[in-house]
Amino acid sequence: MTNQVLEALKNRRSIRKYKTEQIKDEELNAVLEAGTYAPTGMGTQSPLMVVVQDKGTIARLSKMNAAFTADPDGDPFYGAPTVVIVLADSTNRNGFADGCLVMGNLMNAAYSIGLGSCWINRAREMFDTAEGQKMLRGWGVEDKYVGVGSCILGYADCPHPEAKPRKEGYVCLLYTSDAADDLIG
C-alpha cells in the first residue's frame, strides 16, 4: 500500500547542512499549522512553539545547546535559519509526549513542502539553566514550560540522505490471543 503521506513518512530524513536563505513565511506558517494539529492527550493542545529567526538569538541558543555536547564550539543547529523550540506544559502529565508529537508533525510537514529539518536535542537542558529561564521569561513564556526539542528548518544544502535498512525485530507481531497467552504464560 502506498500514498503521499506514507511516502513522506518513509522518505523524510534529518538534514544537517543548510543554505543561509531564510524560508518563506508561507512555508513556515504551513509547518507551524501542521504542528498545531499534532495529537495531544485529551485534545489539550498543551505544547507551545517558539519561532526564532533572528540570527543573534539563534547564535545564542546554539551556544547554549552546544554547552551540553562533546563539541562546545560547534553549531548544533547546523546553520539552519529557523529554529522552532517546542516546549511542554510540565503540569500536564501528557505534556512531553504531546510536544514530541508536535516535533514529528513539524518535521514531516517540512519535508512534504520541500524543506529540510532536524530534531535537535537538549532543549530541556538549555531552558533549565538560569540563562534559559531568563530567555523564556523575556519571551513571555510561563514558568510551567520545559524544553522538548528544537526543530531546525531551512533549505537543504546537501544531497538528500538515503534511508538505512530497517533493523530486524523492530516489530513484534501478535496475531492471535493464543499467541499473546503463550508469551505471557
Question: What feature does the model see in each segment?
Answer:
Residues 1-82:
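N-terminal amphipathic, basic helical "cap/leader" segment at the start of enzyme domains
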Residues 83-87, 151:
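Active-site-flanking beta-strand signature of metal-NTP-handling nucleotidyl enzymes
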Residues 175-180:
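Conserved small/polar residues in nucleotide/adenosyl-binding loops
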Residues 35-36, 84, 91-135:
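Small-aliphatic-rich amphipathic alpha-helix that forms the alpha element of a beta-alpha
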